[in-house]
Design a protein with these regions (language model features):
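Glycine-rich ThDP/TPP pyrophosphate-binding loop and its adjacent helix/strand module
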Residues: 1-168
């Protein structure tokens, strides 16, 4: 997270139109470095996008059990930064929100926090059993698979056929 702020500062000092993007999990928003970085990025109006991949669990603890404010994007307001929640399993929605945030940063308006609501289909680590997650919850999220949803949208919009998607 702080490395992205450093990259954003470098871009601003060099006068480029680059925007630094940092991707991190929901658990990282409970670390001091998240808050320190947002504060400095806001003060310096850095061209940065901070993307929270809210997959519902920090290790094996649900967000609602570890965060008094489960809307993690709302934390950005404390630093005068726009924060937005988006369906992280909707490729088009994520693209639109990220594009707007990048455009904002390029206009010199500073950073944005984008919280992508998604789900981790496996345990946190390869060796971890994910038995702490209810089976119904896992099944519900399987229905929201972003690859399948994008494929359906492409077909519905006449942009691709099922056969073309199979080849991909």
């Amino acid at each position: 997270i702080p490395i992205a702020a450093g990259a954003a500062l470098s871009a601003r000092v060099r006068g480029t139109d680059q925007v630094a993007v940092s991707f991190f999990g929901d658990g990282a928003t409970n670390e001091g470095v998240f808050h320190e970085t947002l504060n400095m990025a806001s003060l310096w109006k850095l061209p940065a996008l901070f993307v929270i991949e809210n997959n519902q669990y920090a290790l094996s603890m649900r967000v609602v059990e570890s965060s008094a404010q489960p809307n993690l994007a709302a934390r950005a307001a404390a630093y005068a930064i726009p924060g937005e929640q988006v369906d992280g399993n909707n490729v088009v929605a994520v693209y639109r929100a990220a594009a707007a945030a990048v455009a904002r940063a390029r206009r010199g308006e500073g950073p944005t926090v984008l919280e992508c609501i998604t789900y981790r289909m496996r345990g946190h680590a390869r060796f971890e059993a994910a038995g702490y997650r209810p089976a119904e919850e896992v099944e519900r999220w399987k229905q929201l698979d972003p690859i399948l949803r994008l494929g359906e949208a492409l077909q519905a919009g006449g942009l691709a056929t099922g056969g073309e998607l199979e080849q991909i």
